[in-house]
Amino acid sequence: MQAYISISFSKRKELEKEVQAIKNALQKCGVSGFVFVDEYQFSAKQEKKMMQKAMEDVEKSAILIAEVSEKGIGIGIEVGYAKAKNIPVIYVRNSKSEHSTTVSGIADFRVIYENEIDLEEKLEKILKTLSVSFKPHQTRTN
């Protein structure tokens, strides 16, 4: 089972500790973390291919974790797509970062953290409550 970790492409390196904390919490709950921006590289001319692949990977995920300490348009698109597919969304941000009303407003759970240790602990608690209802997402076919 996988969790899609949605983060800002341009700020990925700055969020390394946070991404590792998210992956640690997921691992403790038997879920693998998938970071789209770490897995693929697309040229500017490949925008359709990029978005198609992102949607496919969101659909393969049991949950989506949106790290919005650094905002990004792509995060909002991925969150909206996950919600449209009935995939639970967890909103995650550092307490010192600006609040994202759109992502928070659509999220099923929220984690506001002080540091990566706090993030890992809070996220793990939410994941444990979700573990009872974790089911691999099934894509509908016509």
Feature names for model-found ranges:
Residues 1-142:
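Conserved catalytic or regulatory cores that recognize and/or transform ribose-phosphate-containing ligands
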